Amino acid sequence: MTQATLIWCHGSLSQPWGDKSKALSEIAANAGLTLDAPDFQSMENPDDRVEFLVESLQDAPGPVILTGSSMGGYVAAAAAKQLDVAGLFLLAPAFYLPGYAIHVFSNLPETISVVHGWQDDVVDVDGSIRFSKQHRADLHILPDGHRLSESIPTIGTLFSHFLEKFTGQE
């Protein structure tokens, strides 16, 4: 079986290799996967990021698994409309915001996990609740803010369980 292509989409003001992506990369490595993190810092428009991601993954080997935080969560879900994606793991995704082109998501995989903080003052948790309800996603709401910095160990556990669906490891 071909190894999955695992991609991290960072948020608007973030960099590719912050605390969350480093933690998820380590968990992915333990599962035998490599997490790649494209650099979107030169692209302010989220839909430019979507276009870039879709173009870069057109010929990706194996199943494609997209992960992302905030704007990166939106980018991952929006790109899934145009790609054959096996799974989405989204942290505080920026859904249903003004200025973002896509508000109706389709062609999404069955395996979707969404993590959001109750105290998020940047992206309202209601968007994650709405999205998760519409797409039957696993939803985890944690006592944390937008960055989810206090919840990285919990997110790591959730990500490990999420990846088990693709690696067969338990």
Q: What are the functions of these language-model segments?
A:
Residues 17, 121-127:
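Conserved alpha/beta-hydrolase "acid-adjacent" motif
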Residues 108-109, 113-116, 120:
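Short beta-strand/loop motif that positions the catalytic acidic residue
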Residues 22, 126, 149-165:
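Post-His helix in hydrolase/transferase enzymes
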Residues 67-77:
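Gly/Ala-rich beta-loop-alpha elbow adjacent to hydrolase catalytic centers
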Residues 32, 133-149:
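Catalytic histidine neighborhood in serine/cysteine hydrolases
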Residues 65-66, 88:
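Conserved alpha/beta-hydrolase fold motif
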